[in-house]
UniProtKB/Swiss-Prot annotation:
Residues 12-103 form the ATP-cone domain. The modification Phosphotyrosine is found at Y786. The modification Phosphothreonine is found at T778. Disulfide bonds join C229-C455. GDP binds at S213, S228, N438, E442, T615, A616, S617, T618. This is Ribonucleoside-diphosphate reductase large subunit. The record marks Y748, Y749 as: Important for electron transfer. GO terms for molecular function: ATP binding; ribonucleoside-diphosphate reductase activity, thioredoxin disulfide as acceptor. ATP binds at K16, R17, E22, E23, V24, H25, F26, D27, K28, T64, D68. The active site is at N438 (proton acceptor), C440 (cysteine radical intermediate), E442 (proton acceptor).
Length: 812
């Protein structure tokens, strides 16, 4: 067979990078792949297999670059045989990029600075003159500090994500290597402080942490908009105010920012407008305008689609229409499906639902000030308006709750955030009432018509602190956290702000957001099942360490730069830290009294510090599982240009390989079990416990973990709820459990599992009736059946409210 392949290759030629033609040689391709197999398990990785498939895909005149791309994709497609194939695929792709790009960082930076747009023939620098001069002045040290072999540490999918969106391009051709990008980010943050830049570069390149996507996109460029999150309050309930907010959202989205916008103050449908003697159209037509802005103005010129989350308090008269906006069916003029929706829920609403009480829907024009107060003040004002008969209408609180659950089951929205918890446990409560969160529900900051809240983010890779002895290095975690805190604080000062209101807010309050990724990976490396006591303790102590390290770093900054402007009167200025607001006692890992004494003397430089975000893109780049999430599956599909293939959880694959259990039959069993290994008896129980997916972990335990770490999170957390088959009772129990646990974010997305078997539609031609036959039985399309179904769902919901803990245990 190899002889035949040699005959075939002798008739083919490739075009080299310098334009020369050369015959294709089987042995030469194999040798190139073989050289990249260092430290891989050669019992499973076979370079000849890849070469054979490469030869089959060749044509006469193929370029060496195309040949490398093909070899990389073929290796990636073999990942389900062994995870080392993903490493090999990345090495082939990285090696290819290295051949296409210059080596010296200073040379690459010079090319980026002298970039000429070939369409206009004008010089358009891709990096700033200031940073170009810094690099030029320190070229020798910066060039020698870069370790290019670290590029080979990425897996294939992480590297391809970098290529697609993060590495700077010149006229469509990638100009940077990953190490160049990381040094650009370090120089972009630290400027002339070369020691700090090299320190940051090393931690980034060793993958201890990563800055957020906008920072990776724009550091050291002419417009370094490095912030991820912006929180806006409508400037006014008027045409002028609304369209000023539209413009603000467009400018932020243009600069790659995600948006959280609260619309509590906009008058409800049918309310009179004195200036025109007409009536208001309410929220829906206005939100359709924002929907179109989000579609048109994407984040950073095509890097990511524009993304706006709209926040509303549930007393607003248009709340029922608001809940319909993302649904798949219904009139187009009543839908705005490209926005995301969130409820900013006061405790009073939850109490009324629980007691099956009435709920009054109000217009902010007729009942002003409700969104400006929280807690007892809100309840007094709301009940005063009720007594004065100012409500537009009154409904049963449970009927609105039912509509909320119905929308969540269909669309995964609205997000659920608890207004009073967000304000009661905020270090910014002295500034004013917090009116909304951000796009991803982890940022909780004060915003006002003249202040747009901003947050700069970074996430720490928790798996990096597991030692070879399977202990956790909290000391190193604290050290890295302090560096991350100081980096994020520096970004506040060097950042390009798309709007003056954003600059004003960020310089006054100086909040930052430190998150995490790879928590599930860390647990697997420690051999702790997700629901174990050991995992619970590690979860808490990790966040104790991050909060402690961030506060310590912020206090050190305050010693030299002073506290942030609005520090006086804040809970921290009174010696009250986040865990005090939760009535929680930390473990004895750190000396909190010593820290409180330092803060009492010097203050802190930043009002807020910790905010675990989703980390979708950066976790993929780093090869980690997202945030604090458990794995959603142990096998999943990846799509590349050459087709689809299965990828297995690399930790599981290594464990099964070591147990001599990995083969095609095992792979097929996992695929047929939809990524679960719980029913595969040949796998030892301890291994099965370690690899439970999020669908096999009780929601109650994930909420408890969220509350345990929440006591050390001074912002909030992007907390998803995963329910394989949601019903109204389960969701009601979950929301009430998270509310009573004290969470600020009760739910980011509701994640559900698609039915195992596709639903089959049948049509009765005689009667013209449509029926759905699926896993959950048959639901005929008659009004009677619809009513019966609705009554059953309502009964589930009421049952869960009446039985609470019993429902929580059995249902989740």
């Amino acid at each position: 067979m190899l002889k035949n392949k040699s005959m075939k290759t002798s008739k083919l030629y490739v075009i080299k990078r310098d334009g020369r033609q050369e015959e294709v040689h089987f042995d030469k391709i194999t040798s190139r792949i073989q050289k990249l197999c260092y430290n891989l398990n050669m019992d499973f990785v076979d370079p000849v297999t890849i070469t054979l498939q490469v030869i089959n895909g060749l044509y006469c005149g193929v370029t060496t670059q195309e040949l490398d791309n093909l070899a990389a994709e073929i290796a990636a497609g073999l990942t389900c045989n062994h995870p080392d194939y993903a490493i090999l695929a990345a090495r082939i792709a990285v090696s290819n990029l290295h051949k296409e790009t210059k080596k010296a960082f200073s040379d690459v930076f010079e090319d980026l600075y002298n970039h000429v747009n070939k369409e206009t023939n004008q010089k358009v620098p891709l990096v700033s003159e200031f940073h170009y001069n810094v690099v030029k002045k320190n070229a020798t040290r910066l060039n020698s500090s870069i370790i290019y072999d670290r590029d080979f540490g990425y897996n294939y999918f992480g590297f391809k994500t970098l290529e697609r969106s993060y590495l700077l391009k010149r006229n469509g051709k990638i100009a940077e290597r990953p190490q160049h990008m990381l040094m650009r980010v370090a120089i972009g943050i630290h400027g002339e402080d070369i020691d700090a830049a090299v320190e940051t570069y090393n931690l980034l390149s060793e993958r201890y942490f990563t800055h957020a996507s906008p920072t990776l996109f724009a550091a050291a460029t002419n417009r370094p908009q490095l912030s991820s999150c912006f929180l806006l309050t409508m400037t006014a309930d008027s045409i002028e105010g609304i369209f000023k907010s539209v413009e603000q959202c467009a400018m932020i989205s243009k600069s790659a920012g995600g948006i959280g916008l609260n619309v509590h103050c906009i008058r409800a449908k049918g309310t009179s407008i004195c200036g025109t003697n007409g009536t208001s159209n309410g929220l829906v037509p206005m939100l359709r305008v924002f929907n179109n802005v989000a579609r048109y103005v994407d984040q950073g010129g095509g890097k990511r689609p524009g993304a706006f989350a709209i926040y509303l308090e549930p007393w607003h008269s248009d709340v029922f229409e608001f809940l319909e906006l993302k649904k798949n069916t219904g009139k187009e003029e009543n839908r705005a499906r490209d926005l995301f929706y969130a409820l900013w829920i006061p405790d009073l609403f939850m109490k009324r639902v629980e007691a099956n009480g009435d709920w009054s829907l109000m217009c902010p024009h007729k009942c002003p000030g409700l969104h400006d107060v929280w807690g007892d003040e809100f309840e007094k004002l709301y009940e005063k308006y009720e007594q004065e008969g100012r409500a537009n209408r009154t409904v049963k609180a449970q009927s609105l709750w039912f509509a909320i659950i119905e929308a969540q089951v269909e669309t995964g929205n609205p997000y659920m955030l608890f207004k009073d918890a967000c304000n009661r446990k905020s270090n910014q409560q002295n500034v004013g009432t917090i009116k909304c969160s951000n796009l991803c529900t982890e940022i909780v900051e004060y915003s006002a018509p003249d202040e747009i809240a901003v947050c700069n983010l970074a996430s720490i890779a928790l798996n990096m602190f597991v030692t070879p002895e399977k202990t956790y290095d909290f000391k190193k975690l604290k050290e890295v956290t302090k560096i991350v805190t100081k980096n994020l604080n520096k970004i506040i000062d060097i950042n390009y702000y798309p709007l003056p209101e954003a600059r004003k807010s960020n310089l006054r309050h100086r909040p930052v957001g430190i998150g995490i990724q790879g928590f599930a990976d860390a647990l697997i490396l420690m051999r702790f099942p997700y629901e174990s006591e050991e995992a619970g303790l590690l979860n808490q102590q990790i966040f104790e360490t991050i909060y402690y390290g961030a506060l310590e770093a912020s206090c050190e900054l305050a010693q030299t730069e002073g506290p942030y402007e609005t520090y006086e009167g804040s809970p921290v200025s009174k010696g009250i830290l986040q865990y005090d607001m939760w009535d929680k006692v930390p473990t004895n890992l750190w000396d909190w009294q010593k820290l409180k004494e330092s803060i009492r003397m010097h203050g802190v430089r930043n009002s807020l510090l910790v905010a675990p975000m989703p980390t979708a893109s950066t976790a993929q780049i780093m090869g980690n599982n997202e945030s604090f999430e458990p794995y959603t599956t142990n096998i999943y599909t990846r799509r590349v240009l050459s087709g689809e293939f299965q990828v297995v959880n690399h930790h599981l694959l290594r464990d099964l390989t070591e147990l001599d259990l990995w083969d095609d039959d095992m792979k097929n069993q996992i695929i047929s079990s939809r990524g679960s290994i719980q029913n595969i008896e040949t796998i030892p129980p301890k291994v099965r416990d370690l690899y439970k997916t999020v669908w096999e972990i009780s929601v109650k335990s994930t909420i408890k973990m969220a509350a345990d770490r929440g006591a050390f999170i001074d912002q909030s957390q992007s907390f998803n709820i995963h329910v394989a088959e949601p019903n109204y009772g389960k969701l009601t129990s979950i929301h009430f459990y998270s509310w009573k646990a004290g969470l600020k974010t009760g739910m980011y997305y509701l994640r559900t599992k698609p039915a195992a078997n596709a639903i089959q539609f049948t049509v009765n031609k005689k009667q013209g009736a449509v029926s759905m036959n699926g896993q959950n039985g048959t639901a005929e399309g008659s009004p009677q059946k619809y009513e019966e179904d609705r009554e059953r769902k309502m009964a589930d919901m009421v049952c869960s409210l009446e039985n609470k803990d019993a429902c929580m245990s059995c249902g989740s």
